[in-house]
Amino acid sequence: MASKANMVRQRFSRLSQRMSAFQINLNPLKEPLGFIKILEWFASIFAFATCGGFKGKTEIQVNCPKVGVNKNQTVTATFGYPFRLNQASFHTPPNVSVCDVNWEKHVLIGDYSSSAQFYVTFAVFVFLYCIAALLLYVGYTNLYRDSRKLPMIDFIVTLVATFLWLVSSSAWAKALTDIKVATGHRIVEELEICNPESGVSCYFVSVTSMGSLNVSVIFGFLNMILWGGNAWFVYKETSLHSPSNTSASHSQGGGPPTSGM
């Protein structure tokens, strides 16, 4: 037991010595391993910023001749991240009653928060992981390349991140398609108040451009490509691709010395 405890202490002491030896080495950034990690870092920022920062609105015009109003009046519903459309109610201009209807009781249809939040949350985690990985590449280059576990952990995380980028981007792309439908021309069909029997005629006017959301989907799949491509370069750092330095040194010095002639 004492020998095992001493071995553990020695390992921790060696690890602490390596961690304390922080030296900035920018050479890994010139290699694909570090350079692609920088691209992944930037791409993750664009992914969660373009999605999480979106705010928009959709407008319809209302005409109700049965109550003596023959002019079109505008009713607006605002929405944004995390896209709980079923909580986005319609609003009229201040101190204006449109067709004697309480429009705040009428909301958009659909809840797409699960796909949007999963996408943004994962992108933020990727952003933080890229910072930690770059710090390890640049500040602890020797520790990373002399270790067997760190490159393997990095490789596993890279594979998992590639898969999750595919899943989250696909789910978010599908949700975005549904959001466009739910905030577009179909509003008039879905609103119960907009029917001839109620005497209220509704006409779709406009909806905020969702170009930034389209960009977020593009960056999602771009991230998937970057992480998938970087998996090869991370794999090359693992013991699966090349033997460790320890094994190499044993193989070189393990044979019996040759006798001179």
Curated annotation (Swiss-Prot):
Subcellular location: Cytoplasmic vesicle membrane; Melanosome
Pfam families hit by this protein: MARVEL
Membrane topology, record value: Multi-pass membrane protein
InterPro entries per UniProt: Marvel, Synaptophysin/porin
Vesicular compartment segments: 55-117, 173-214
Keywords: Cytoplasmic vesicle, Glycoprotein, Membrane, Transmembrane, Transmembrane helix
PROSITE patterns in alphabetical order: MARVEL
Primary localization: membrane
GO cellular component, one term: secretory granule
Keyword Metal-binding found: no
Comp. bias regions, Gly residues: 252-261
Stretches of the chain found on the membrane's Cytoplasmic side: 1-33, 139-151, 236-261
Region (Disordered): 241-261
Residue spans crossing the bilayer: 34-54, 118-138, 152-172, 215-235
Tissue: Ubiquitously expressed.
Positions annotated as glycosylated: N72, N95, N214
Keyword Metal-binding: no
Compositionally biased intervals (Polar residues): 241-251
Domain MARVEL: 28-239
Family of this protein: Belongs to the synaptophysin/synaptobrevin family.
Entry protein name: Synaptophysin-like protein 1
Source species of the chain: Mus musculus (Mouse)
